[in-house]
Structures are given as structure tokens and as C-alpha cells.
């Protein structure tokens, strides 16, 4: 699958140019729309008929700032592991193949949340998330009320849980720019840091993991602050079903990217790539 053809390649191999009518009998499917109902609203349909050029999707991610601040001090790693994110740390930084992700999006069906491949249907499962990243897939869901708070209120919460209050310019509504978290890590952890300071540093790393990697969005550089209160008690953070939240984010990102009008995609795409590459 890593070297698979996209639909624009299929047109080329068949000698069909973008401005050439599709030969009779050649149909992109589906023939029956009882289940597969997206029709013309799917990226694959638009590429097949030459309505879009089939350019690669822009893969948005913002986790480099996190990996640039590794290895992480052992005293901080202990709390990250306690929160259930040790497997993500062990996976390390991985490049994302934009062509592979784009080809997979062309084969993704929002109606069934599966990839339609020549060999049949396939998808990413909770078991994949658990095995590859060690994220918890049982327990309470990652949900909550997105309560509006002023910048001053969020600043006080950041001071308590992260050990610093970001400048006003780093806030974007109820989101925080990831750059300020990475800059906070530029100052090394003192050798005599207290237990509370180690916990605060661990929360900074976890927010970078969530906003830049596991639950990233197309902003490419912001994390919703609604995650921060969930990180207050690191002993209970690992009980949440972060694996379910991660998989739901991936599904939503794939469904959104099938829209022909979309040019970018975000989410835990490294997971998708790792799962897909063995299928060749």
C-alpha cells in the first residue's frame, strides 16, 4: 500500500486525460447507493472525473517541538508513564508520507468508517491504538463541558498546573498556542526540582502530545484548553480512554478529508501510516 496508485494515476494508465470523457462501462462506483451514499461529495469521485487534480493533502502536525525536547528527565517520565502516555514516548518521532495518507483518504468511506481496497475492507481499530501506543481503551470517555473561561482564568489554571502563565498573545479563544509550551521546556528542569515542579513539567509534555500529535487539528499549532483540567490528577489521567479519543479523532479527520473542497488533514496520522505500511 505504501507505493499504491491514486485515482489520478489510474486515469493516466488507462489513457484518460482530465478533459476526456469516461469510456462507457468504466464506473468509479458504487453501483448501489443503499449504504455508500456520499456519491459526488467524495474526493475519489471528483478525482475520477477530473474535477480536481488529485494533489496531495497537506498533512498538518505540530509535534516537532515535543520531540526536540527529548529525552525527558526520568523524574518527569515517571509521571508521563503514570498518565498512560509512555508508549507514545517510546514510539519516537516518525515522518509522515503525504502521498500514502492521500491515497488512503481516497479509499476511505465515511458511511462505514472503512477503507475500500481491492482485497476488501479494512480499518484501524481500538486494538491497533492499544498495541501500537499503549493507550488505554477502557474506562471513562474523554468528555466534558467546554466551559468558557476568560484569559485571566485560564492563566491562573496554567500557573497552577503548568507552572507558568502564558502571555495574552498565546491564547486564541479557548485554545493555547503550542509554541509557548515548547518555549517553557527550553528552560531545563532544575536538579533540585520539587515533586510539584516535575508534575507541572509532565503536564506540559502531555499537552504537547495531545495538541500536536494524538488529537491535533488543522490549526497546526494550538491545543484546546479543555484538556488541561483533565490533567490535574495525574494518577487518574491514565484511567481515561485516550485510545478511544485518538481513534475518534482519526475517523473524524478522515471523513472530513474526503470532502473534495478540503486540502488539508490532521489527527493521529502516524497511527494510520504505521498500521497501513505492512499491507503491501
Question: Predicted segment positions?
Answer:
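Hydrophobic/basic alpha-helical segments enriched in Actinobacteria
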Residues: 129, 255-258
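Flexible helix-coil junctions and inter-repeat linker/turn elements that act as hinges
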Residues: 215-219, 259, 280
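A glycine-rich phosphate-binding loop feature that marks nucleotide/adenosyl-phosphate handling sites
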Residues: 268-274
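Cationic, amphipathic, low-complexity alpha-helical segments enriched
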Residues: 274-280
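N-terminal leader regions that mediate targeting or early regulatory function
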Residues: 1-251, 267
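Acidic, serine/threonine- and proline-rich low-complexity regulatory regions
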Residues: 257-265
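Short, well-ordered loop/turn and helix-capping segments at boundaries between secondary-structure elements
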Residues: 135-138, 256, 277
Amino acid at each position: 500500500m505504501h507505493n499504491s496508485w491514486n485515482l489520478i494515476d489510474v486515469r493516466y494508465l488507462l489513457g484518460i486525460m482530465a478533459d476526456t470523457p469516461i469510456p462507457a462501462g468504466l464506473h468509479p462506483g458504487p453501483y448501489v447507493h443503499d449504504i455508500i451514499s456520499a456519491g459526488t461529495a467524495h474526493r475519489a469521485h471528483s478525482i475520477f472525473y477530473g474535477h480536481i487534480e488529485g494533489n496531495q493533502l497537506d498533512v498538518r502536525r505540530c509535534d516537532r517541538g515535543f520531540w526536540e525536547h527529548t529525552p525527558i528527565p526520568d523524574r518527569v517520565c515517571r509521571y508521563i508513564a503514570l498518565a498512560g502516555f509512555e508508549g507514545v514516548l517510546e514510539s519516537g518521532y516518525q515522518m509522515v508520507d503525504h502521498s500514502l495518507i492521500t491515497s488512503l483518504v481516497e479509499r476511505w468511506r465515511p458511511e462505514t468508517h472503512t477503507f475500500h481496497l481491492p482485497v476488501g475492507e479494512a480499518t484501524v481499530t481500538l486494538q491497533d491504538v492499544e498495541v501500537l501506543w499503549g493507550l488505554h481503551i477502557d474506562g471513562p470517555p474523554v468528555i466534558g463541558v467546554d466551559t468558557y473561561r476568560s484569559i485571566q482564568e485560564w492563566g491562573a489554571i496554567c500557573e497552577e498546573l503548568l507552572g507558568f502563565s502564558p502571555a495574552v498573545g498565546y491564547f486564541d479563544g479557548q485554545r493555547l498556542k503550542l509554541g509557548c509550551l515548547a518555549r517553557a521546556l527550553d528552560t531545563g528542569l532544575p536538579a533540585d526540582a520539587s515533586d510539584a515542579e516535575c508534575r507541572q513539567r509532565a503536564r506540559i509534555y502531555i499537552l504537547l502530545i495531545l495538541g500536536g500529535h494524538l488529537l491535533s487539528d488543522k490549526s497546526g499549532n494550538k491545543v484546546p484548553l479543555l484538556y488541561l483540567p483533565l490533567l490535574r490528577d495525574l494518577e487518574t489521567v491514565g484511567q481515561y480512554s485516550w485510545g478511544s479519543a485518538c481513534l475518534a479523532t482519526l475517523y473524524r479527520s478522515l471523513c472530513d478529508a474526503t470532502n473534495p473542497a478540503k486540502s488539508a488533514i490532521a489527527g493521529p496520522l502516524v497511527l494510520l501510516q504505521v498500521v497501513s505500511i505492512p499491507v503491501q
